[in-house]
Amino acid sequence: MTISFLLRSCLRSAVRSLPKAALIRNTSSMTEGLQPASVVVLPRSLAPAFESFCQGNRGPLPLLGQSEAVKTLPQLSAVSDIRTICPQLQKYKFGTCTGILTSLEEHSEQLKEMVTFIIDCSFSIEEALEQAGIPRRDLTGPSHAGAYKTTVPCATIAGFCCPLVVTMRPIPKDKLERLLQATHAIRGQQGQPIHIGDPGLLGIEALSKPDYGSYVECRPEDVPVFWPSPLTSLEAVISCKAPLAFASPPGCMVMVPKDTASSASCLTPEMVPEVHAISKDPLHYSIVSAPAAQKVRELESTIAVDPGNRGIGHLLLKDELLQAALSLSHARSVLVTTGFPTHFNHEPPEETDGPPGAIALAAFLQALGKETAMVVDQRALNLHMRIVEDAIRQGVLKTPIPILTYQGRSMEDARAFLCKDGDPKSPRFDHLVAIERAGRAADGNYYNARKMNIKHLVDPIDDIFLAAQKIPGISSTGVGDGGNELGMGKVKAAVKKHIRNGDVIACDVEADFAVIAGVSNWGGYALACALYILNSCQVHERYLRRATGPSRRAGEQSWIQALPSVAKEEKMLGILVENQVRSGVSGIVGMEVDGLPFHDVHAEMIRKLVGATTVHM
């Protein structure tokens, strides 16, 4: 009894065997109307769970259908000529592969109580490479292109619990955007990669040692690009430990009718992706739809107004807000800092710019489920604890924020603060954010805009940012409005040239991303809004979860509630006033920030940002 005959029996479809057909690596030239697929055969008792498992992990396991003795797979029954590319199936007993069979005659009785699943294998990376004008690379071995087991877990359903399997192609860095456009044109969202960059971020130790197939060699100018692989089904079969199961071996497929309806439905303009570098060490790129990216750019333009006429337009760098937000979107744990003691003759010396933006960002990070903490000056610890407590009491925050201090004296102290047990391979935080935080100048002092040295009021939190530059996996963002804030070292040349007193006050400490705003609080609000846009974007959201598990957009309602609002920010500023925190420019204890009244200026900015964020994409 041949495999093709059993498929015919199980699926009640006409199946004719091509027993001598060669292994086909590139399916782009297959017979029109047919597409390649892989087969999984499981006991009927496991069928509902496996169907749910595939539906919960659509990226690696796009299920075309299933059939049993009393059911016909619609896609297969529509055609009388279903051809078997490889007349082979792997046999599994209790999760162990016991061999490859070309005849299942001895299992004909068991097959009556089994269900066959057909998994779509039609997306061709080679076709996308060809369309993008990227030459194919030769394999280092005779089999199909390599696939790798990752440490990324698929969504667990009943007894199906396994890692995601991915396939990789090396792509020249300057061809990444073109490749993503080609994959979108061919297959829409289903053709998008789930990781671009360092394989270690997927738990892959060596690209030269694939778990399946042959290695495709990378060149120095290449970036590894990874797609979910249907070979994940083999790991699923192993994990369920069924007493008997069968599955297509790697590289072996059957041909089924093409699913033209689903292919056409996914080709939508709003899904056209952009790719952006968000980290050099480790190398990491993220993707987002073009419309979502444009909305974030609109936020960046909105906050770039210069109400104080300081000349901040000279400090602007394109897409810093977008790249900072993309990096934050991938982070699991974020450390936020704020505090600029410009009023050194008053108690407290802090200003009203900074804490509201920091709290607004922290609130949204919490809504996304990210671990969030704050680090402040020891001198101001009690003040910030009261601010957070009052923010929770008045509904500005839902969850307490751990508040830390740092008074280390060396880079070793800073590394110990950032890393578990001082191990650079185990950072406590993925991303550091400074919002209106006093920044160290080139001479080691800290200056306000009037060139007054306030070093005696500032703890060396800058050292944490400097130490992070040498720890792989930690990124940083600085938000400022005058160039003397922590992180603005990235634009210090422009600060020295264009900002009043810039030659003295310019911060010398650089962040990976420098977000420039007319008022720093606006930068914090804009980061929260940008994170909402990104996580509401189907392209980015799928990339974040590696195309496994359910969509995270189910939390969208709680995200809306976590966005800044005029009501919440009015309460937040009121809390600062109650604690005698003063406006930065005027020194007034009142409802203003940087000398600008809340209701006339800041409330309008919040409305603009949130309105642009929540409008339909």
Curated annotation (Swiss-Prot):
Modified residues (N6-acetyllysine): K93
InterPro entries, sorted: D-Glu_cyclase, D-Glu_cyclase_mito, GLUCM_C, Putative_hydro-lyase
A GO term from the CC aspect: mitochondrial matrix
Keyword Mitochondrion belongs to the record: yes
Pfam families according to UniProt: D-Glu_cyclase, GLUCM-like_C
Phenotypic consequence of gene deletion: Accumulation of D-glutamate in heart. Mice develop normally and do not display any visible phenotype under normal conditions.
Protein's GO biological process: glutamate metabolic process
GO molecular function (one): D-glutamate cyclase activity
Entry's transmembrane regions: none
Family: Belongs to the D-glutamate cyclase family.
Protein name according to UniProt: D-glutamate cyclase, mitochondrial
Native species: Mus musculus
